[in-house]
């Protein structure tokens, strides 16, 4: 799939400073999500001395860190709860017409993944970086019913032989 099929959304830009003899020197960090709105989404955090460079790097990292989301009628196959650091996110499947009920950070990721109906809740720390990573980890852990059946069949087969 060509790189141009991906939509890019900036979630966060932050400025950090270090002290030099002549004063403060700034660096920028950018958190960017890329997705095709058809089940593929990636997240990247880029750091550089200038904002455009940081955003460019973040986009590059996001394209290297893609996740395939198993969508079912515009929602996810099952409820999932994931912790990342002190942040926790809960994703719940929703009926068609519900929309994306989510905070700004999970909303950006879920919309670019192609999710149209979902309920979410952020718990614990609301740090946008940790929430973004928790959301991506939740999407990475999603399994369809067929996936689980295939995995369990493999386990049963392995146990029978062992």
Swiss-Prot record:
Q: Which UniProt keywords apply?
A: Ribonucleoprotein, Ribosomal protein, RNA-binding, rRNA-binding
Top-level taxon of the source organism: Bacteria
In terms of InterPro entries, this protein maps to: Ribosomal_Su5_D2-typ_SF (IPR020568), Ribosomal_uS5 (IPR000851), Ribosomal_uS5_bac-type (IPR005712), Ribosomal_uS5_C (IPR005324), Ribosomal_uS5_N (IPR013810), Ribosomal_uS5_N_CS (IPR018192), Ribsml_uS5_D2-typ_fold_subgr (IPR014721)
Task: List, in alphabetical order, the GO biological process terms annotated in this UniProt record.
Answer: translation
* Other facts noted in the record for this chain: Is positioned such that it could physically interact with spectinomycin.
Question: What role does it play?
Answer: With S4 and S12 plays an important role in translational accuracy. Located at the back of the 30S subunit body where it stabilizes the conformation of the head with respect to the body. Binds mRNA in the 70S ribosome, positioning it for translation.
User: What does UniProt say about this protein's domains?
Assistant: The N-terminal domain interacts with the head of the 30S subunit; the C-terminal domain interacts with the body and contacts protein S4. The interaction surface between S4 and S5 is involved in control of translational fidelity.
Q: Quaternary structure? A: Part of the 30S ribosomal subunit. Contacts proteins S4 and S8.
User: Would you identify the family this protein belongs to, as annotated?
Assistant: Belongs to the universal ribosomal protein uS5 family.
Q: What is this protein's record name?
A: Small ribosomal subunit protein uS5
Upper classification of the organism: Bacteria, Thermotogati, Deinococcota, Deinococci, Thermales
> What gene name is given for the protein in this entry?
rpsE
């Amino acid at each position: 799939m060509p790189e141009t099929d991906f939509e890019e959304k900036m979630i966060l830009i932050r400025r950090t400073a270090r002290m030099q003899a002549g004063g403060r020197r700034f660096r920028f960090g950018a958190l960017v999500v890329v997705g095709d709105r058809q089940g593929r989404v990636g997240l990247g955090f880029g750091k550089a001395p200038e904002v455009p460079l940081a955003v460019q790097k973040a986009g590059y990292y996001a394209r290297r860190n893609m996740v395939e989301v198993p969508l079912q009628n515009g929602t996810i196959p099952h409820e999932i709860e994931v912790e990342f650091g002190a942040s926790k996110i809960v994703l719940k499947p929703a009926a068609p017409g519900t929309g994306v009920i989510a905070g700004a950070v999970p909303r950006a990721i879920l919309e670019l993944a192609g999710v149209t109906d979902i309920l979410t809740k952020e718990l614990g720390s609301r740090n946008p970086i940790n929430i973004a990573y928790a959301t991506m980890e939740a999407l990475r852990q999603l399994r369809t019913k067929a996936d689980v059946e295939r995995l369990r069949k493999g386990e049963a087969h392995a146990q029978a032989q062992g």
